[in-house]
Structure formats: structure tokens, C-alpha cells
A protein has these predicted regions:
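Rieske [2Fe-2S] iron-sulfur domain-containing proteins
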Residues: 1-261
């Protein structure tokens, strides 16, 4: 079949999904040994473009599942729980898909009206197969860092610019471009206010491993950082509370005996 020959396809989404699964299953058993190097590279481009478009289709599907709370029919209380447990994606991939969908899908408001994507230029690039979910996650990350005081038109222009450069860059490259854009929009941090800090703040305490150790991740406000600095200055000075030294002074530095130190 010629590459430009039209193929009659059904309109029903479920039928299209079943058809795509059959195509992928057939492709998985295909032998590429007879293909030329040029054909191999062309096929890789086609498949990557298809995968990126699948990200867009998946986002549209998840938006409908979320709007209709269809995940409850599967016994889950939230979309995230359905993705992580029902589809067995795990928390990390479930979060990635939620972020992608929130940025490029057409969601419904409380009145049932379908809204335009939050990131319209990004959604268009995904529909073209030019960028994928990893690009969308980085664009979302950069857009969240734009101060609230920035004019909405400037913000929209920033999203369009990020989507444009994403068509030619890796996700890491988009992040670099995003940081340059942020430096241009708010070079000295003067536009960032308390609303932005509250919106961006986060603190995560990971679960304990087999050694009962836990990882910590966070993005601290100036106030919380100051509290940590006071605690570290008091309890973590050199020579204080050293578990390798039974004779090490215990407690706060202010309460330690100078003679012992």
C-alpha cells in the first residue's frame, strides 16, 4: 500500500483503539531485517510521531473519564488512583499523565462547557506528533514558575514560545530554554510575591526503605528555610550529636557544657 493512499477508518473511538492495538501487535512481530537503513530510520520517525499523538489521544480520553468520574465504575475514588492502581502505572507515571492531560486536553467546566486547552500551542504540537508527554511536563513546570503578576498575554506568549522551541529540542533543552525565558520575564525576582511562593512550595517525605531511611524532597519558602537553618545551627554544629562518638554532646548547642566541648 502506498504511503499516501487513504485508508477508511471507523469514527468510533473504541473501534479505533482496538484497531490500533491490532496494528501494534502485528508490527511487534514484523521483521525489519529486509528494510534499508533509510527505511529503518523513517519507520522510527513514524512510530515516534505516532507515540506522541497517542499522548494527545490518551489525554483526551482521560479528560472524559475524569469529567464523568468513570473511574468509579472500576472501583476507584479518583483518576489518579485509577491510573496508578487500575492501569497499574504507579504513582509517578500516573502523575505524569495527569499533568499532561491538564495541559493539553479540552476539559469541561462546572456548566458542562468544553474549554480550550490550558496550553493551546503545546496541544497543537502534540497533535502534530512534534512533541510528547515529556515535553509537556517540562512546559508545565516552566509555566508554573512564571510569576502571577506577569500579564496574561505575556504568559500566553511564553507558552507559545516554549511549544515552538519544543518542536526542535529535547525535554532537557526545553527546560534550559524555559529558564532563560524566566530570567527575561523576571530577571531580579521582583515580580514574585507570596502567592507564587505558596503556589510553588512543596515538601515530600518518602517512605522508609529496608534500612528505615527516608528520602526528602522539597521546595522551601523563605520562612521554612529559616526554621531549618535555626534547627541546623542549634543541633547540627560540628561535634554536636555525633552518632559515631558516644561522648559527643547531645541536645542543642546552647545547652552544651563549654568544658565538654
Amino acid at each position: 500500500m502506498a504511503a499516501n493512499q487513504a485508508v477508511a477508518l471507523p469514527d468510533d473511538p473504541a473501534e479505533l483503539a482496538a484497531l490500533s492495538e491490532a496494528v501494534i501487535a502485528k508490527l511487534a512481530t514484523a521483521a525489519f531485517t529486509a528494510s534499508t537503513e533509510g527505511q529503518l530510520l523513517e519507520t522510527a520517525e513514524i512510530l515516534e510521531r505516532a507515540n506522541r499523538r497517542f499522548d494527545g489521544a490518551t489525554s483526551a480520553l482521560l479528560a472524559e473519564i475524569s469529567d464523568r468520574s468513570a473511574y468509579r465504575k472500576a472501583g476507584f475514588l479518583s483518576l489518579h488512583a485509577y491510573l496508578a492502581g487500575g492501569l497499574r502505572l504507579g504513582d509517578g507515571e500516573a502523575k505524569r499523565r495527569r499533568i499532561t492531560g491538564a495541559g493539553i486536553a479540552r476539559l469541561a467546566n462546572l456548566q458542562g462547557e468544553t474549554l480550550a486547552p490550558v496550553f493551546p500551542a503545546t496541544a497543537e504540537a502534540v497533535a502534530d506528533g512534534a512533541i510528547g508527554a515529556d515535553h509537556v511536563v517540562v512546559i508545565d513546570e516552566m509555566m508554573r514558575k512564571i510569576p502571577s503578576a506577569v500579564d496574561p498575554q505575556v504568559r500566553a506568549g511564553a507558552e507559545a514560545r516554549l511549544a515552538e522551541v519544543a518542536r526542535d529540542l529535547t525535554p532537557a533543552g526545553v527546560r534550559t530554554a524555559g529558564h532563560r525565558l524566566l530570567a527575561h520575564l523576571d530577571p531580579d525576582g521582583a515580580l514574585t510575591d507570596e502567592r507564587d511562593r505558596k503556589r510553588l512550595r512543596q515538601f515530600g517525605l518518602g517512605g522508609q526503605d529496608q534500612r528505615l531511611m527516608s528520602k526528602v524532597r522539597g521546595y522551601l519558602t523563605p520562612e521554612l528555610r529559616a526554621r531549618f537553618e535555626v534547627m541546623f545551627d542549634s543541633w547540627a554544629k560540628p561535634g554536636m550529636n555525633n552518632p559515631a562518638d558516644p561522648a559527643s554532646p547531645r541536645g542543642a548547642a546552647e545547652a552544651a557544657d563549654p568544658a565538654t566541648l
